[in-house]
């Protein structure tokens, strides 16, 4: 009997081992993703006054990121990446701010030290900023950053700085140089797509799962991103590149460039879903990076640099700001980038700023912009509420009340304050301002008021020209004749309101409410599938007893009475 029990126990152990072997998931791969580091030695010199809005943060300019703090942030990130659970770090471009020789030397030293101390490999590709130094060619980039991917590459493209490297026994990284040296636009052309196709075929032949990375976005992550940053999105007008990625087996691609923190998806013609995960700039709000785990599913976790060595900050930053950076660095980044975006909005909503962005050849429109641009900026900076007016009637609330509507009560100071909040929410990820929120209500009514104020002194013909221009710029078609709304101030407000509600609101809604999937902490489908569908618990029990019975029959196979 003891022998029988021992045999049964052995069978159970063998069965357990068989079960684990048969149903084990793929070994996990964990990577850290960080981009748009913008390493720059220029800002290590004494910080000077760049704004008169916030005395404590007077060094903050309109860069929309934190260049003075960049080196301290990068070192803080490397310290955290050294301790986290990832096996490698991938960097989809803009490693430096301008590709200068001293910048490259400085960041290479930091990366080399990180690899030597941690044993973790860094894999990098260029961004447009890395090519801003026209002396930097793909060949030079490959030489400068040789130990960060190229040294382990199983294949390197001759014409670009693209390469392929195995991250593990199961996963292969296709690191794509998506840039055109000296320009901001992407360079994913037919020849690069052919190279991607070829790598996809090789990966399939080798049984590898392809993970992609490059600098410019593959998919659109915000409304009008293809208009706002021409050439910054590979598939802004043509989705054929996404089809190539899907067929090549690149289910996930990591990008940068736009400084958004967002995940977008695309369903190919054959039903394959691919994901483009763009990570916010490391020098942006909350200094974000991702830790991504590849297994049966793909788990995204957003983290941010929690602490920096404030002794690395340049002179000229106020003591109060340094103290905040020391005690609560995430809050420091939020205050500083909010201020920077306010400066950006103010810069581009003047006559000069609008003409610089739009670059119009239409003399009539340029003349109208000269007339209305500064009034537009004035309206955006007006107090939102009457209680804060410095001049009677000069508030957004006073304007909308003239047209029998109202604003919800909030803590926002003006329209730019609101715009910064909404824009920052998009940059941070998982933004959620539905159409019924106070923010969207104020945004739509406030924009109508701003347009009415800005266009109050133009002719009827100029008024209709501006509204039709906005409609054309946004690429929409609405059956509205704006010449019917050019008469009284009331009619002009109605025209502006129609423009906002029928054209802008649907587009704003797409920007203020994040579509699935989530952006920050989310679990998405993996590459790996079980060799066969895992049986149910009941099926496992039946299989166990069948195996047990077969074993017992085998044990007594030579007993005469069992063979009769």
What positions do the PLM features span?
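His/acidic metal-ligating clusters that form di-metal
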Residues: 82-85, 172-174, 183-273, 378, ...
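Non-catalytic terminal accessory segments
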Residues: 2, 25-27, 314-564
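N-terminal active-site segment of His-dependent metallophosphoesterases
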Residues: 24-101
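Active-site neighborhood of phospho(di)ester-bond hydrolases with catalytic His/Asp-centered motifs
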Residues: 33-35, 89-93, 121-128, 211-215, ...
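Active-site-proximal beta-strand elements of phosphoester/diester hydrolases
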Residues: 28-41, 170-181, 213, 274-281, ...
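Solvent-exposed loop/turn segments at secondary-structure junctions
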Residues: 37-40, 95-98, 128-132, 179-183, ...
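Sec-dependent N-terminal signal peptides of Gram-positive bacterial secreted proteins and lipoproteins
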Residues: 4-22
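Extended active-site neighborhood of metal-dependent phosphoesterases/phosphodiesterases
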Residues: 101, 105-201, 269-275, 291, ...
